[in-house]
């Protein structure tokens, strides 16, 4: 069977491994886990970052497809490794929602014009794509859904499960998971992750 399934979704690594093994055993098909990062805008531009796991020869065969939809893809090894790296990506990205919300709340408390922060810090160590993208939306309370809070919580729950499997402490992710749980329990709306700042503002001043 020459069938190749290229999975760009984010799933638990152990589930990916089990499914890929069963699929190959029953049908002979190959499974490549290739979760992506970059968001809707990068997807439209074909500039996603892709983390790849699976048989190296099969990955080489689908390389033209990966190159077409990404600015960069990186092969990490056996099936499931792409999903593990995606969780590393999520640890960095999703905790930044809470960190940037805290920074915005701190700026507000001291009457600092937070809209100037991304440009002010762009050439320092704090400068990042996340600061440029998320911080203005947090400051201006632009909560139009781009990264749903419910999806963020789901991914943080996945991080927790994988960390527990290896007895790896993830205190930052655990706290961020608690914050998003509180946020989602407080509203029935489809909230963007940037609305996490609503838990931190002490007033509307």
Regions flagged by a language model, labelled:
Residues 2-4, 10-90, 94:
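Rossmann-fold dinucleotide-binding core
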Residues 81-199:
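Helical "substrate-binding/catalytic lid" subdomain
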Residues 201-205:
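Conserved small/polar residues in nucleotide/adenosyl-binding loops
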